[in-house]
C-alpha cells in the first residue's frame, strides 16, 4: 500500500515505515502530523485517485529530525572582466517517518 501526498509544493510517494525528507515544517521533533492532501492511494488492485484530493484520506507521520542538506555552490563568472563570485547554500529540511495511511 502506498500513497501520493503533497507538501512543500512537491508530490511524494510514501509507504508505511519509510523515511521521507521534505521542506522544513514548523513542528517539534517527536510530534505527530496528519497530512490531508492525499492525491492518490494504491492498495493492491484498488486505486483511488483524487480530483484533486481523495476525500477522507490522510497520512500520519512522525517528525524524526530537522537538519540542513548538502551544500551546493552557485558560481557567477564573466569572461575577460576578471569577475568571479561564488556563493553556497544549504537548504533546511524535515525528516519524517510514515506511521499510517488512512483511506
From Swiss-Prot:
GO terms for molecular function: rRNA binding; structural constituent of ribosome. Keywords: Ribonucleoprotein, Ribosomal protein, RNA-binding, rRNA-binding. GO terms for cellular component: cytoplasm; ribonucleoprotein complex; ribosome. It holds the Pfam family Ribosomal_L21p. Coiled coil: none annotated. The keyword rRNA-binding applies. InterPro entries: bL21-like, bL21-like_sf, Ribosomal_bL21, Ribosomal_bL21_CS. One of its GO terms (biological process) is translation. Part of the 50S ribosomal subunit. Contacts protein L20. This protein binds to 23S rRNA in the presence of protein L20. Belongs to the bacterial ribosomal protein bL21 family. HAMAP family: Ribosomal_bL21 (MF_01363). NCBIfam families: L21 (TIGR00061). This is Large ribosomal subunit protein bL21. It comes from Psychrobacter arcticus (strain DSM 17307 / VKM B-2377 / 273-4). The lineage of its organism: Bacteria, Pseudomonadati, Pseudomonadota, Gammaproteobacteria, Moraxellales.
Amino acid at each position: 500500500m502506498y500513497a501520493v501526498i503533497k507538501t512543500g509544493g512537491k508530490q511524494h510517494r510514501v509507504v508505511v515505515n519509510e523515511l521521507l525528507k521534505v521542506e522544513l515544517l514548523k513542528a517539534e521533533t517527536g510530534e505527530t502530523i496528519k497530512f490531508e492532501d492525499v492525491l492518490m492511494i494504491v492498495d493492491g488492485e484498488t486505486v483511488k485517485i483524487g480530483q484533486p484530493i481523495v476525500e477522507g484520506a490522510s497520512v500520519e507521520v512522525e517528525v524524526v529530525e530537522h537538519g540542513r542538506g548538502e551544500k551546493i555552490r552557485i558560481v557567477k563568472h564573466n569572461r575577460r572582466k576578471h569577475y568571479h563570485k561564488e556563493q553556497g547554500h544549504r537548504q533546511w529540511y524535515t525528516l519524517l517517518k510514515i506511521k499510517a495511511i488512512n483511506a
